[in-house]
Curated annotation (Swiss-Prot):
Main location: membrane
Name of the molecule in the record: Integral membrane protein 2C
Lineage, broadest ranks: Eukaryota, Metazoa, Chordata, Craniata, Vertebrata
Residues with PTM Phosphothreonine: 39
Originating species: Mus musculus (Mouse)
Disulfide bond among keywords: yes
Gene Ontology biological-process annotations: negative regulation of neuron projection development; neuron differentiation; positive regulation of extrinsic apoptotic signaling pathway
Length: 269
């Protein structure tokens, strides 16, 4: 704040004031000098403009957050579609209910045509096959669950009638690998290829009891756990079917190739 005072002029001004003072009397003698108080004007500052740099950085951050949210949404949507659509379709494509006609030269001298049905599950990533053979309509074999484990190189037969398991080395000359078997069944499903209708026979004999089932791998372990399990040794494989006669053998008919296989398990305990 600036204080400005006006003082009376020297000489003539003093004489005039003296005359006026004498005329006005003592009241005016005590009048103070005039003062004006001036408040200095505020210094005007130019308006500050916001930094464009800060604004651009904020915009980039918001854009990045939006992109992250969008990508997360796409990822979750992809996972949902994969789990509920692709995997479901893949499971359907890996499950087959199959039926094949074949000539049976064992039941009678006259060759008759029989139909063999089975349910097949092919696990491509785990590299194994699981086959369920229901009770045959016209005899000729026992119902069974079969696992071909290509990782362990083992085959396990669970004879449902006996409730016993039998394990043997995987015969890759008869059993198609999962990928090849899957392609075969897909072609059959489309009607572009039909398997041949002949049957071969393989004969096996029981050798020893298996105590450590965990050493057989998780797939066979889950199939045979809680059941008497035995090792098998392959005796012969032949195209011609021999009658079993008085042999102590159980038969399981199945197919995992372009032909039907009758597996004879002899020396059953």
């Amino acid at each position: 704040m600036v204080k400005i005072s006006f003082q009376p002029a020297v000489a003539g001004i003093k004489a005039d004031k003296a005359d006026k003072a004498a005329a006005s009397g003592p009241a005016s003698a005590s009048a103070p000098a005039a003062e004006i108080l001036l408040t200095p004007a505020r210094e005007e500052r130019p308006p500050r403009h916001r930094s464009r740099k800060g604004g651009s950085v904020g915009g980039v951050c918001y854009l990045s957050m939006g992109m992250v949210v969008l990508l997360m949404g796409l990822v979750f949507a992809s996972v949902y579609i994969y789990r509920y659509f692709f995997l479901a379709q893949l499971a359907r494509d890996n499950f087959f209910h199959c039926g094949v006609l074949y000539e049976d030269s064992l039941s009678s001298q006259i060759r008759t045509r029989l139909e063999l049905e089975e349910d097949v599950k092919i696990y491509l990533e785990e590299n194994y096959e699981r086959i369920n053979v229901p009770v045959p309509q016209f005899g000729g074999g026992d119902p069974a669950d079969i696992i071909h484990d290509f990782q362990r190189g083992l085959t396990a037969y669970h004879d449902i009638s006996l409730d016993k398991c039998y394990v043997i080395e995987l015969n890759t000359t008869i059993v198609l690998p999962p990928r090849n078997f899957w392609e075969l069944l897909m072609n059959v499903k489309r009607g572009t290829y039909l398997p041949q209708t002949y049957i071969i026979q393989e004969e096996m004999v029981v050798t020893e009891h298996v105590r450590d089932k965990e050493a057989l791998g998780s797939f066979i372990y889950h199939l045979c756990n809680g059941k008497d399990t035995y090792r098998l040794r392959r005796r012969s494989t032949r195209r011609r079917i021999n009658k079993r006669g008085g042999k102590n053998c159980n038969a399981i008919r199945h197919f995992e190739n372009t032909f039907v296989v009758e597996t004879l398990i002899c020396g059953v305990v």
